[in-house]
Structure formats: structure tokens, C-alpha cells
């Protein structure tokens, strides 16, 4: 199936781009950012956002080469195939998951002709279930043992069941229904769980247990922790727990859960935020109307990613500029810096989504990849990050590309003017200053004050962070990650490295529990040595 698709190294444009990378656009030359209307020309508008990329080390020749890469690798054609239900999660000729990839179907709800009908109808059915469930909560039909309303929902899950929903909830916390909140339990660390439980009014709390298989080790363990706490405090856990799981899994049990919502094999955990994995939590805290706005934003960004012209397609252009930085300029990491405190958990979500997707060394035909794949993803909010690690970004020996995210208006609309400008104006001034300073640098005979410049960055900019805009932002990055995986000709939808760690953890647990008496492998030797004298 994938033999007809090229990786970037197999394209005709690869050699030309490699030549251009020997002398990339010099952002430090006088007037570099203003030459040829660069600031005006190097921007793309789409779905509430503008992408400004004049501060990247690209020029028209590079952009033409990247367009050729997109065309030769059939990036948009592969994206369309994914959206319409092609089996994209596979490795040709080798044992693999062999699944469709349909996270986009969970929000393809707003046109008469969805890209893929069967998964779309399931998504609509789950949303209808959620709407009825939320209505019953609001009407007082679902209450606790004392007849009181639930005020808190706790998401119990790990990986994609935690990071994406947590990032979006924190981003949209300003829109929460008065009197409702969310909390999260993810780590199997007992201290984390017990501290989370200590901060709750258990009687007014619903626990949302998320596991597609119904057997995820950390989640099953934490669910037992939660149920014990409920029992010890005199509560019926079946009246306080709901599940999001695969249909027919051990967690699809009406006797043990207040309600169950379904998650399907064609939706990977890191891409599941617009499924019930995120929507149940967001529906409880924000309300169903805001959930639909969030999904609409994601759906519209999905549709805009269907454009073949890279200068009209924000996620595709971001993906290709990222490939330019990674494969041609040999930049090994990428910092995500949102100038919005509401997005403080978003870099962690993107870290998982990107690195678990594209941290691969085998292509889709089971061969070793020919070049570099996904960069290391990290980040923090601005302007805090300026006072944490920007020293390294400015003057370190390893240049770090940055994707900035910003908004012209604050989310809550409360501000103060000090020294002639508002806090939001100060925030934006700092954002814009970083982009210009990183690009242009500063000459100084004192080398300790010398800034080399040519540190590439771009900016995703919108008016205000709303549920619609958050959905659009999430889908933008999902599409970007998928496009890059297609360009590298890797499977962005499995995580075999994670599976190996899980298998070995189970072997250690059997050794700790004495289930393999007489077995003396590396597990036994490792445990004996590490724990000796502790």
C-alpha cells in the first residue's frame, strides 16, 4: 500500500533543498525582515488564526521546494485518504495494528456529507448520549446518595486520556459553569492519587475512568484506589463512576458504572481529545454548547487542511517549515511557547502527540528511515519562559526553533494599566520582541553580549482564546503532526516503544510479587541490586 508513497529523501526536490540549506535566508542582514514586503507576504490566514513566518529562515526558493515536497509525497492526498477511512496505521509486510485513523470523524458533524460515514454516525450517537446525560445532571435526575448535585468531575486516565483533555480544560477554564470544576488523576504514583483525593468532596464527585481496553495498568490501579476511597467514606462507587472505554471491554459494565461512553480502535489516545475522552469532561465543566463550539473549530481546521497550496494551508505549511528546520538545517528540537497562561499544559500535550507519533526509526515498509524524523518537543508559557530558559535559546550552541502562540485579547477581559500600558500589551510586546531579537540578533564587540541571530520562529496568532479557537488550534497541530509523518513515510499512529516498556513492567511486577519463583533473569538481578541497602 505505502510503496507508492515517497519520503522526502526520495523526492526530486530534496537535492535542491539540501543545496539551499547551505546558505539559508540570513535574517540578520540589514532590513531582512522588511525586504520585498516580507512581513506582509510571509503570513497565512485560516480558521481564526494567522500564521506569521517571516522570522523563519525560508525564502521563495525554499517555499517552492517545500511545495514540491508536498506534491511528490502526496501529503494532502494521504490526509484525505486518512479522513475517508483508509487503513493508515500499518507497516506493509509486517505485523502491525492495521487500523483506520479517524479522529477527524469525531468532529466532522457540521456538513451534510461527512468524509467517513460509519465512524461519523457513531460519534453522533455518543454525543447524543452525552447530551442526555448532561441534561439529566442539570435537571437533578442524576444526583448523589444525599440527593445533591455533582460539582466535580475527575478524569482518571493516562497518556492521551489525560494530557489532551487536561490541556484543553485548563485552556478553557474561564468558560466553566459556575460551581463546577475538574481534577485529574493520571500517575500510578500513590502519593499523586492520595493528594488528589484529599482535595475532593467525594460525595459530590464523579470519576471519569478512561481506558480503551479497560485494562490499562495505571488506570485500573487508580480506579481501585478511587473505589476504595469511596467505599471507606460510605459511598456507592457505582453511583460515582462513569467509564469511557471500548464497547464490550471489562469497563463496559452497567452494574459498575453510572454511565458508559465508547471509544473506538480507529481513534488513538493522543488524538482522542475530540472524542468522548475529552468531551465528557468538557461537557460537564463547560456545557454542551461550548463542546459543540470546540468541535466546530476543530472540524473547520480539518477542512482547511485539505488545501494543496501550502501558502493557503496553515498546518501543512507549519509541517513543511518544521521539516526544513529538522532535515535541512539539522535543528533537533522545537519549543512551543504560548503567550497565554491558559495554555500552560498545551506544550505537554503536544510533546506526547508529536513525539509518540513521529519518534520513529522505521518507515511504513519496515525499513530503517533514511533521515531524521520527529524533533524533541518541549515548551512553557511566555513571558515566564523568558526568565527560565531563553538564555539558552539566545546564546546556546544548539539553536532551537520556536512556535509561538498568541492572542490580541486576554481571555477574561480583566486588565490594568501601569506605566502607560496594559498587562496584555506588555505580554504582546514581550512576544513580538522575542521573535525580532531571535531573528536579527545583536552585534557587540563584547562576545558575552553578542547575539548571533538567525534563530528561527513563527507565530500562530488569533484574536482571543475561545472554545472554537481552541478546537481549531488543537486540530491544527494534529494535522501538522500527521503531515510530517506522511513526509517521513513513517507510521504516526502506533507506539511500539511504549508497548515494550509495558511488557517489561509486567515482568518486573511478577518478579516483585513472587509469581516467577526460581526465575533468575535480569529483572531479579536488577531488583536485588537496586533495592540492596535502601
UniProtKB/Swiss-Prot annotation:
Major location (coarse): cytoplasm
Subcellular location: Cytoplasm
Catalysis performed (reactions): alpha-D-glucose 6-phosphate = beta-D-fructose 6-phosphate
Keyword Cytoplasm: yes
Residue numbers annotated as active site: 356 (proton donor), 387, 502
Presence of keyword Cytoplasm: yes
Keywords from the UniProt entry: Cytoplasm, Gluconeogenesis, Glycolysis, Isomerase
Domain of life: Bacteria
Pfam family, one: PGI
GO CC, one annotated term: cytosol
Any one GO molecular function term: carbohydrate derivative binding
Membrane spanning stretches: none
EC number(s) recorded for this UniProt protein: 5.3.1.9
InterPro entries, per database record: G6P_Isomerase, G6P_Isomerase_C, Phosphoglucose_isomerase_CS, SIS_dom_sf, SIS_PGI_1, SIS_PGI_2
Pathway(s) this gene product operates in, as recorded in its UniProt entry: Carbohydrate biosynthesis; gluconeogenesis; Carbohydrate degradation; glycolysis; D-glyceraldehyde 3-phosphate and glycerone phosphate from D-glucose: step 2/4
Enzyme class: isomerase
PANTHER family hit by this protein: GLUCOSE-6-PHOSPHATE ISOMERASE
HAMAP family with a match to the protein in the record: G6P_isomerase (MF_00473)
Protein family (similarity comment): Belongs to the GPI family.
Biological role: Catalyzes the reversible isomerization of glucose-6-phosphate to fructose-6-phosphate.
Protein name (Swiss-Prot/TrEMBL): Glucose-6-phosphate isomerase
Upper classification of the organism: Bacteria, Pseudomonadati, Thermodesulfobacteriota, Desulfobulbia, Desulfobulbales
Amino acid at each position: 500500500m505505502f510503496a507508492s508513497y515517497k519520503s522526502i529523501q526520495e523526492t526530486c526536490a530534496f537535492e535542491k533543498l539540501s543545496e539551499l540549506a547551505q546558505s539559508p535566508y540570513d535574517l540578520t542582514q540589514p532590513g531582512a525582515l522588511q525586504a520585498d514586503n516580507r512581513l506582509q507576504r510571509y503570513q497565512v490566514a485560516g480558521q481564526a488564526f494567522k500564521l506569521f513566518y517571516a522570522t523563519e529562515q525560508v525564502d521563495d526558493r525554499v517555499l517552492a521546494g517545500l511545495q514540491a515536497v508536498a506534491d511528490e509525497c502526496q501529503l494532502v492526498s494521504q490526509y484525505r485518504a486518512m479522513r475517508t477511512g483508509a487503513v493508515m496505521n500499518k507497516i506493509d509486510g509486517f505485523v502491525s495494528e492495521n487500523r483506520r485513523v479517524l479522529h477527524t470523524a469525531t468532529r466532522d458533524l457540521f456538513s451534510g456529507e461527512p468524509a467517513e460515514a460509519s465512524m461519523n454516525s457513531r460519534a453522533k450517537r455518543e454525543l447524543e448520549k452525552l447530551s442526555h446525560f448532561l441534561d439529566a445532571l442539570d435537571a437533578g435526575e442524576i444526583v448523589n446518595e444525599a440527593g445533591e448535585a455533582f460539582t466535580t468531575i475527575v478524569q482518571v486516565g493516562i497518556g492521551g486520556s489525560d494530557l489532551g483533555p487536561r490541556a484543553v480544560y485548563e485552556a478553557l477554564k474561564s468558560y466553566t459553569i459556575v460551581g463546577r470544576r475538574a481534577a485529574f488523576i493520571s500517575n500510578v504514583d500513590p502519593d499523586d492519587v492520595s493528594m488528589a483525593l484529599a482535595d475532593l468532596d467525594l460525595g459530590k464527585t464523579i470519576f471519569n475512568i478512561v481506558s480503551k481496553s479497560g485494562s490499562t495498568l495505571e488506570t485500573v490501579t487508580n480506579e481501585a484506589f478511587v473505589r476504595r476511597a469511596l467505599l471507606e467514606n460510605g459511598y456507592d462507587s457505582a453511583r460515582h463512576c462513569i467509564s469511557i472505554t471500548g464497547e464490550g471491554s471489562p469497563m463496559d459494565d452497567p452494574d459498575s458504572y453510572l454511565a458508559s461512553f465508547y471509544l473506538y480502535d480507529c481513534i488513538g489516545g493522543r488524538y482522542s481529545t475530540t472524542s468522548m475522552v475529552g468531551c465528557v469532561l468538557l461537557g460537564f465543566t463547560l456545557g454542551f454548547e461550548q463542546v459543540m463550539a470546540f468541535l466546530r473549530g476543530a472540524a473547520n481546521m480539518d477542512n482547511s487542511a485539505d488545501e494543496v497550496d501550502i501558502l493557503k494551508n496553515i498546518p501543512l505549511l507549519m509541517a513543511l517549515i518544521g521539516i526544513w528546520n529538522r532535515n535541512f538545517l539539522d535543528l533537533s528540537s522545537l519549543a512551543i511557547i504560548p503567550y497565554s497562561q491558559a495554555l500552560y499544559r498545551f506544550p505537554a500535550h503536544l510533546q506526547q502527540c508529536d513525539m509518540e507519533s513521529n519518534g520513529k526509526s522505521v518507515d511504513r515498509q519496515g525499513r530503517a528511515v533514511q533521515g531524521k524524523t520527529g524533533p524533541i518537543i518541549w515548551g512553557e508559557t511566555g513571558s515566564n519562559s523568558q526568565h527560565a530558559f531563553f538564555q539558552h535559546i539566545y546564546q546556546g550552541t544548539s539553536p532551537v526553533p520556536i512556535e509561538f502562540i498568541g492572542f490580541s485579547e486576554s481571555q477574561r477581559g480583566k486588565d490594568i494599566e501601569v506605566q502607560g500600558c496594559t498587562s496584555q500589551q506588555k505580554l504582546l510586546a514581550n512576544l513580538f520582541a522575542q521573535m525580532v531579537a531571535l531573528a536579527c540578533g545583536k552585534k557587540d564587540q563584547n562576545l558575552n553580549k553578542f547575539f548571533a541571530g538567525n534563530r528561527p520562529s513563527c507565530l500562530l496568532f488569533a484574536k482571543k482564546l475561545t472554545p472554537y479557537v481552541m478546537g481549531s488550534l488543537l486540530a491544527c497541530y494534529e494535522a501538522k503532526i500527521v503531515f510530517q509523518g506522511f513526509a517521513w513515510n513513517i507510521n504516526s499512529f502506533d507506539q511500539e516503544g511504549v508497548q515494550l516498556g509495558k511488557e517489561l513492567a509486567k515482568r518486573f511486577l511478577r518478579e516483585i510479587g513472587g509469581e516467577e519463583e526460581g526465575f533468575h533473569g535480569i529483572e531479579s538481578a536488577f531488583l536485588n541490586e537496586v533495592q540492596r541497602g535502601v
